[in-house]
């Protein structure tokens, strides 16, 4: 993938741009049209200091200490202190791509001109992104209100020459990180530390990654599901547009259309049993548009929410320069992100659950009319028997991980922050769930290809044959038992590359052009 050259117009990021940011390094610049609003907001903060007004976050303490007035000579220390004291995360570091996405989201939010932060601070973040220097940010420690304080504090420590960063996979000090980007440590002005820390950008970055994973899984599950229909000699009748039109759910209709797109009438396998006496297929084949359509709807709903959040201002307090006003609110509360992530979790779990059932159908000779466990000479060969057990284990894990996180809340900051979103965990677990579902789909991919080979000399449709050939270039037909795990890994690697997206109809998925 070529490096994305992105000129940022604040508040105008698209989902496709965000997908690219999450997948590869970028060259980022700020559109000149953003500069006046940024400068206007910093001038409001400067007037507050000059006029000795009391404003939260500028010359007061934070959280429960909001009523504590800070002396003028301590204002810069206050901003440095909030960054260092709030960098209290724990656990493994976020992946570089997650940090890059989080930084771009933060730059986008700050550049809208409602945060009272100077242009040179924003430019430092841009320079770090362009130098591929990514702060080391622990994954755990945020409850998603007041924003993602700990993760964003760890991101911000590097601006001070503190903390750690990663460059080309190597962990370096914050001071070394700045040198690589051609920067010097900065002294934060009033409001700037709080502006950097307040916001939903860590949760949103995790959730966006979950969205992109869910989209890729949806595409692969649709392709693998269509392959399984062919391998099991399933009927095409359940994908008839009339069925889905009378129910009326747009995403169900679109899902059925995708199956018709893959299972076109040129399939020799389909023609070979067009006059068979079987009346109905099991639900895992027949109800794919209904189940996958519901998953697609959750993906689309979540995409809409996350696109808005990606372009939002989630700082507090907010600076309204045109009114010379600064207002405390609660845009840092990540409840929309948490609920979107919970819905993505449901979709990811269901995509995997349905795939596991299709694979189980294929290895059951009574249902699929294929050799038991998809291998000849059964008894001597166990075939795909234990691969299905692996799928079942992964599907079961996802059922537990899919439990909604947004229904939980624990009060923090001496009950000043008495309801929180848990958005960071809600979004962070999506990667693990996605890995589980990808593993399930890898097993189905192998199984469906094996089943299709047993239908030779008949061929499927061109797109299904293309999907099978992608796999067969990496994994050969199973004529007898062999070491299975490497083949699952090869199939998994293909799915991770989103190889099936090109086989899907255009404009089906929100971030895939």
Curated annotation (Swiss-Prot):
Kindly tell me the pathway this chain contributes to: Amino-acid degradation; L-histidine degradation into L-glutamate; N-formimidoyl-L-glutamate from L-histidine: step 1/3
Q: Report the principal subcellular site.
A: cytoplasm
Which cellular components does GO assign to this protein? Answer: cytoplasm
Write out the coiled-coil annotation as residue ranges. none
Which compartments is it annotated to reside in? Cytoplasm
Return the broad EC class: lyase
Superkingdom: Bacteria
Give a short account of its post-translational modification: Contains an active site 4-methylidene-imidazol-5-one (MIO), which is formed autocatalytically by cyclization and dehydration of residues Ala-Ser-Gly.
- Catalytic function, reaction form: L-histidine = trans-urocanate + NH4(+)
Q: What is its EC number?
A: 4.3.1.3
The record's InterPro entries line, in alphabetical order, gives: Aromatic_Lyase, Fumarase/histidase_N, HutH, L-Aspartase-like, Phe/His_NH3-lyase_AS
Q: Which Gene Ontology molecular-function terms are recorded?
A: histidine ammonia-lyase activity
Keywords for this entry? Cytoplasm, Histidine metabolism, Lyase
Q: Quick one: a GO biological-process term for this protein?
A: L-histidine catabolic process to glutamate and formamide
**Crosslink (5-imidazolinone (Ala-Gly)) position:** 145-147
**UniProt keyword Lyase present:** yes
Tell me where in this chain the PTM 2,3-didehydroalanine (Ser) is found.
146
Q: Which PANTHER family match?
A: HISTIDINE AMMONIA-LYASE
Annotated NCBIfam families? hutH, PRK09367.1
- Family note: Belongs to the PAL/histidase family.
Task: Enumerate the HAMAP family for this protein.
Answer: His_ammonia_lyase
Name of the protein in question: Histidine ammonia-lyase
**What is the originating organism of this protein?**
Vibrio vulnificus (strain YJ016)
């Amino acid at each position: 993938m070529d490096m994305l050259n992105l000129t940022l117009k604040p508040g105008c990021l698209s989902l496709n741009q965000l997908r690219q940011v999450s997948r590869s390094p970028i060259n980022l610049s700020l559109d000149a049209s953003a500069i006046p609003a940024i400068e206007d907001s910093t001038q409001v903060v400067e007037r507050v200091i000059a006029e000795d007004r009391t404003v939260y976050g500028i010359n007061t303490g934070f959280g429960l200490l909001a009523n504590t007035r800070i002396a003028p000579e301590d204002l810069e220390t206050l901003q440095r202190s909030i960054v260092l004291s709030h960098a209290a995360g724990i656990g493994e570091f976020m992946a570089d791509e997650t940090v890059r996405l989080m930084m771009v989201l933060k730059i986008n939010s700050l550049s809208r001109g409602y945060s009272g932060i100077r242009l040179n601070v924003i430019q430092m973040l841009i320079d770090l992104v362009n130098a591929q220097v990514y702060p080391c940010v622990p994954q755990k420690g945020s409850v998603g209100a007041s924003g993602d304080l700990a993760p964003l504090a760890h991101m911000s420590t590097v601006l001070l020459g503190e903390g750690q960063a990663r460059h080309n996979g190597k962990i370096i000090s914050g001071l070394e990180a700045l040198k690589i980007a051609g920067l010097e440590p900065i002294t934060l002005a009033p409001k700037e530390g709080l502006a950097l820390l307040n916001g939903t950008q860590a949760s949103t970055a995790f959730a966006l990654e979950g969205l992109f994973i869910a989209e890729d899984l949806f595409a692969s599950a649709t392709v693998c599901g269509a392959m399984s229909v062919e391998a099991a000699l399933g009927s095409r009748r359940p994908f008839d547009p009339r069925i889905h039109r009378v129910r009326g759910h747009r995403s169900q209709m679109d899902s059925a259309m995708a199956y018709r797109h893959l299972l076109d009438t040129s399939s020799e396998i389909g023609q070979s049993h067009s006059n068979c006496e079987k009346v109905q297929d099991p639900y895992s084949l027949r109800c794919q548009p209904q189940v996958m359509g519901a998953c697609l709807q959750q993906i689309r709903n979540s995409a809409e929410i996350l696109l808005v959040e990606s372009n939002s201002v989630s700082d507090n307090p907010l600076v309204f320069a045109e009114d010379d006003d600064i207002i405390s609110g609660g845009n840092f509360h990540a409840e929309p992100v948490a609920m979107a992530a919970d819905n993505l979790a449901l979709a990811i779990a269901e995509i995997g659950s349905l795939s596991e059932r299709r694979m189980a159908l294929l290895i059951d000779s009574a249902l699929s009319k294929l050799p038991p466990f998809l291998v000849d000479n059964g008894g001597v060969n166990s075939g795909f028997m234990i691969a299905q057990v692996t799928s079942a284990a992964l599907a079961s894990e996802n059922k537990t991980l899919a439990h909604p996180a947004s229904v939980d809340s624990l009060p923090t900051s001496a009950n000043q922050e008495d309801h929180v979103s848990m958005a960071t965990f809600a979004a962070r677990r999506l990667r693990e769930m996605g890995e589980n579902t990808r593993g399930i789909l890898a097993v189905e991919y192998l199984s469906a290809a094996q089943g299709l080979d047993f239908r030779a000399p008949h061929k499927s449709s061109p797109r299904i044959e293309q999907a099978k050939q992608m796999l067969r270039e990496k994994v050969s037909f199973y004529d007898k038992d062999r070491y299975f795990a490497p083949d699952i890994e090869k199939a998994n690697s293909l799915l991770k590359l989103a190889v099936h997206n090109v086989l899907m109809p255009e404009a089906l998925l929100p971030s895939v052009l």
